[in-house]
Amino acid sequence: MKHKGMATAALVASMGSAFAQSNVTLYGVADMNIEYANHVGNVPTATNGFNPGPSNNVYRMNSGGWAGSRSGLRGTENLGGGLKSLFVLENGFNLDSGTLQQSGRLFGRQAFVGLAKDGIGQIAFGRQYTSLFDALANFSPTAFATQYEPVVLETGANFREDNTIKYKGQFGPVTAVAHWSFGTGLALPASVGISAPIGGNGEVPGAFRRDTAYGAAVAYSNGPVGVTVAYDQWNPTIGVSSGTMKKAAVGASYSFSDTMRIMGGYRWGQNKNAAGELIQRDDFYWIGATYQVTPALGLALEYNYDDMKNLFGANAPNPWQVSLLANYTLSKRTDLYLSTAYAKNAGLILESLGTFYANSLALGNSYALANGQSNMLGVAMGVRHKF
């Protein structure tokens, strides 16, 4: 009996040790604001003839003005020898209606499992951000804030991709990222320039290339200086074959102090249809700064400009936008914020045919510029709580 008791105690102790090496964290963001925007039209669709409609001023409640509302689980297990397993399950939701974002996915923001090894890096499998998105996120003055950041124009509507293998390694001041998607799981509606829907789930028998995607990035950060270079390619289904959407970008930042940082970058873009014909070619630029006025008050200012060289064979006006975000910290977890932006030759977040109106379709709030208008102004006040 004594030996049996000792064995039982040893088993319990070993189980406690094993459990102590694992952890799971519940986290999330609840973000809500009230917004005013002018010159807003309906999202163009094939059924309305790709017509944004007449001008209207809009007063509305939005979910995710500074950070997308979300909830998630993440965990790791120490496997010994510097090896660990990990997972992330994260959904996005509309706080104003309680509905899911990302086309109703249960875990639409991120869903992956992987392994990480000290000195080698991490490899993960599932729905993940692209290498281009990861690389540029640290060089956005507003940190890709949901409301007025033209993230789709900058990084592509495919900045999250299904069925993805992704590697990330940290080597001193250098970070390397690379990914491959067997099928992005992204579908965009037909537009005035393309009569068929764009994209799909991928993994099509006999058509390996359709809806695949890949990319890579390298970043360097040392002291006040940060630089990055990245590439992304998406091969979406267009009709019965696949097109090619390419993006390459560079970004840089410099911190003058703990309270002030400037950053900017350039992104080259080229989209071709299934026949190899050019449907879009643009050069996108951004510059901005962040300034911590007091321990509680922070500011972020950003300017975006898109040199639209070709859009479905025509010369389109070059859109630009200036935006300002001010946040006031009430605690480590709760903030108040004011955001405003003015866009010219496009809707806010530079929404237009050049983005396939993907922002408006995904968010459910139109920023399509109404007929006969050339600018749009938006102002929003909100609260963000992190848990």
Q: Where are the regions that the model predicts?
A:
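Gram-negative bacterial Sec-dependent N-terminal signal peptides
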Residues: M1-A20
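Outer membrane beta-barrel
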Residues: Q21-A37, A46, P54-G185, A219-G223, ...
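Transmembrane beta-strands of outer-membrane beta-barrel proteins
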Residues: V24-M32, G81, S85-L89, I123, ...
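Solvent-exposed loop segments that connect transmembrane elements
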Residues: N38-V58, T99-Q101, G183-T212, W234-M245, ...
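Residues that define the transmembrane beta-barrel architecture of outer-membrane proteins
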Residues: N57-S69, L106-R109, F159-N163, Q170, ...
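Outer-membrane beta-barrel architecture
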Residues: G72-R74, F112-L115, K166-K168, A217-A219, ...
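Detector for outer-membrane/organellar transmembrane beta-barrel domains
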Residues: V204-T329, T340-Y342
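Outer-membrane beta-barrel "beta-signal"
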Residues: Y328-L330, N371-F387
